[in-house]
Curated annotation (Swiss-Prot):
Its main location: cytoplasm. This is tRNA(Ile)-lysidine synthase. The keyword ATP-binding applies. Ligates lysine onto the cytidine present at position 34 of the AUA codon-specific tRNA(Ile) that contains the anticodon CAU, in an ATP-dependent manner. Cytidine is converted to lysidine, thus changing the amino acid specificity of the tRNA from methionine to isoleucine. SUPFAM superfamilies: Adenine nucleotide alpha hydrolases-like. It holds the Pfam family ATP_bind_3. GO terms for molecular function: ATP binding; tRNA(Ile)-lysidine synthase activity. It is found in: Cytoplasm. It comes from Lactobacillus johnsonii (strain CNCM I-12250 / La1 / NCC 533).
């Protein structure tokens, strides 16, 4: 049994009546994978689709298209092609944008032809380079496991069946099977860190051991296991909720974590919600302090923790606005509706007040007071503190006024004055 067939059995990949989408470039790796799939699948003409995106980044990129047309025609498999329009090329960050456009193209092809699997030709040398790149750039172990052999892209499973093959093995496979391919000439330049690692560092490491690809796979599998153990631990903790412009959780829910585990927990939450890698240092849960890291702020207030992405904080408009009952309105990036009726949407709160067609809404100014049931006034900041809402989030709590009096403050206050003629207003939030 070859490494190729072993990949499918070890990962329980079903073959019968399944459709495969191969991302091909015309290079030696994807050409080898194409040939392996044609030899492996029971009915490649019906089961296999080859997708090729011409990035139009080189004058000779059309040669790859010509090669794939000849090859797929000879092998009797379908080829789907598209060009990345030059006018969409960015001035900077071309590689990231190209990848984004490529995977959007592949996802679209997958949906159109209802393919079950997407296969890419990443191999063991790519894995080694990825590990070294992440080690140099961040040292984050989780990032070193970015090239997983089985993943997901939309409704398709993403498969990388060549990760246990070295580049040399694939070149030998191409030679043995008399396969033509095109080498991207930019791969031979030293202008990128990946290329410099490929040309100068990886060959030295291979001289030290003949098991470098095997060891890289073992490292990747170990990291995947450790990452799963960590995510299982963090997912077993009570999940924070979306609160105003933050994630909010109870400090007691994570009290058993030590300072390093707490830092990793908040790194995990940020990546899970915002897909951004952030690395907090030690986090002491017993101190009511604020931690700032890049565009994120972590703060502890009263019995809660709050995780805020400052990029999502809208500019506060100090002006109140008039809204009509039963009509949706926007406040600080969220949609609300005030009505006397019951709705299926999430109820943000309710209050009692005089019957009216219009209400004033806005952000409660600092220094405001709120009327108690006794008729006395209390400082609004006291009510915010009682409800564990920190200063940074208070302007984002929706306030409703009637006759210049606040009658509702989201998550904080509702009119306490009793009047038999008052009616109930429900405040709904739309996500």
């Amino acid at each position: 049994m070859t490494k190729f067939t072993t990949f499918f059995t070890e990962n329980n990949i079903e073959i019968k009546n399944k459709k495969f989408l191969l991302a091909a470039s015309g290079g030696p790796d994807s050409v080898a994978l194409l040939k392996m799939l044609v030899n492996f699948l029971p009915n490649p003409s019906e089961q296999l689709i080859v997708a090729h995106l011409d990035h139009c980044l080189r004058d000779d990129s059309f040669l790859e298209s010509q090669l794939l047309q000849r090859l797929t025609s000879a092998l009797k498999v379908k080829l789907v092609e598209k060009k990345w329009p030059v006018e969409l090329h960015p001035q900077a960050g071309v590689e990231a944008k190209a990848r984004e456009y490529r995977y959007a193209f592949l996802a679209k092809v997958g949906r159109k032809y209802q393919t079950d699997y997407l296969l890419t030709a990443h191999h063991g040398d790519d894995l080694i380079e990825n590990i070294l790149l992440k080690f140099i750039r961040s040292g984050d172990v989780a990032e070193m496991n970015s090239l997983q052999i089985v993943g997901n892209l939309g409704s398709m499973k993403l498969l990388r069946p060549l990760v246990k093959y070295s580049k040399d093995e694939l070149l030998k496979y191409d030679k043995d099977h008399h396969l033509d391919f095109i080498e991207d000439k930019t791969n031979f330049e030293d202008d990128t860190l990946r290329n410099r690692l490929r040309h100068h560092v990886v060959p030295l490491l291979k001289k030290e051991t003949s098991h470098l690809v095997k060891n890289a796979n073992h490292f990747s599998e170990s990291v995947a296991l450790l990452s799963k153990c960590q995510s299982d631990l963090f997912d077993s903790l009570p999940s924070p909720i979306n609160f105003s412009k933050a994630l909010r959780g109870k400090k007691e829910d994570i009290a058993r974590l030590n300072t390093h585990e707490a830092a990793a927990f908040f790194d995990y939450l940020i990546y899970k919600k915002w897909h951004q890698r952030i690395h907090f240092d030690e986090i002491d849960l017993n101190k009511n302090v604020i931690f700032n890291k890049e565009n994120f702020q972590l703060l502890f207030y009263q019995k809660y923790y709050y995780l805020i992405n400052r990029n999502e904080l809208a500019v506060i408009d100090p002006k109140r606005k008039l809204v009509k009952l039963n009509e949706k309105f926007s406040f600080n990036g969220k949609k609300y509706l005030i009505t006397q009726d019951e709705k299926s949407q999430k109820l943000a709160g309710y209050f009692y007040g005089e019957k009216a067609k219009y209400l004033e809404v806005g952000s409660l100014p600092q220094g405001s007071t709120l009327k108690l049931a006794t008729g006395k006034q209390t400082k609004a900041k006291k009510k915010f503190a009682e409800n564990g809402i920190p200063l940074a989030l208070r302007p984002y709590c929706l306030t409703v006024w009637q006759e210049e009096n606040p009658v509702y403050v989201e998550s904080v206050y509702q009119n306490q004055e009793y009047n038999p003629n008052f009616i109930r207003y429900n405040v709904y939030i739309y996500f």
